[in-house]
Design a protein with these regions (language model features):
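Cytosolic, membrane-interface loops and tails of multi-pass inner-membrane proteins
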Residues: 20-53, 176-191
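Short, non-helical or kinked segments that cap or interrupt transmembrane helices
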Residues: 30-38, 96-106, 135-143
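Interfacial segments of multi-pass membrane proteins
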Residues: 45-48, 67, 71-75, 89, ...
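Transmembrane alpha-helix interface/packing and boundary motifs in multi-pass membrane proteins
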Residues: 11-15, 24, 87-97, 130-134
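Multi-pass membrane proteins that catalyze or facilitate reactions on polyprenyl-/lipid-phosphate substrates
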Residues: 2, 6, 15, 136-191
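N-terminal signal-anchor transmembrane alpha helix
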Residues: 2-26
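Nucleotide and nucleotide-moiety/phosphate-recognizing core
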Residues: 6, 52-54, 62-93, 126-127
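Hydrophobic alpha-helical transmembrane segments
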Residues: 4-9, 53-54, 79-84, 120-124, ...
């Protein structure tokens, strides 16, 4: 029963579409009709309201931190269930007919909660890649790949869970990958 309660509550928290909600409240627009149509932080930045974009980023990270930290300290055997459930909630939110974000900010929240070192590795990798390329999508893919590689090489750790997360992030970025390959991807302004 704990397993199901943790999975469901983590999914529901992860499925709160903050980019959609904030854009509706403050801009009176549907974020799904702006930029890429995605509900996440990068597209929230494309609304032209940087504060809204950063608020979306913070809230999308937080909605993973809350259930994962709670489970980490109270039901540690279920930490990966809580993590995956929150992540899937963001990707496939019940509130938006299962059409959600790409999962990067939520993944950062998961990493920071499981082991803040992993979160910092992700963030630093993302920033370095972004400074070199100006592509948010490429930065997300590189940083997501670095986590399981780091764990395999330096921690001798079973990184199956993190490989699954990378595959899901790659899947959500499949259109970005095509645009990157064809040199049609838009660069992102984050400041």
């Amino acid at each position: 029963m704990e397993y199901l309660t943790i999975a469901l509550s983590s999914y529901l928290l992860g499925s709160i579409p903050f980019g959609f909600i904030l854009t509706k409240i403050f801009l009176k627009k549907d974020i799904r009709n702006i930029g890429s149509g995605n509900i996440g932080a990068t597209n929230a930045l494309r609304t032209g309201n940087k504060t809204l974009g950063y608020a979306t980023l913070f809230l999308d990270i937080t909605k993973a931190v809350l259930p994962v930290l709670y489970v980490k300290f109270n039901y540690p055997d279920y930490i990966f269930i809580a993590s995956l459930s929150a992540f899937l909630g963001h990707l496939f939110p019940i509130w938006l007919k299962f059409k959600g974000g790409k999962g990067v900010a939520t993944y950062v929240g998961i990493l920071l909660s499981i082991n803040y070192i992993l979160g910092l590795i992700f963030i630093i990798s993302w920033i370095v890649t972004f400074l070199l390329s100006k592509y948010s999508s490429l930065s997300s893919l590189v940083a997501s790949l670095i986590i399981p590689v780091y764990l395999i090489i330096f921690e001798n750790f079973n990184s199956f869970f993190f490989i699954i997360m990378f595959v899901l992030i790659f899947y959500t970025h499949r259109e970005n990958v095509k645009r990157l390959k064809n040199k049609e991807e838009s660069k992102t302004k984050i400041y």
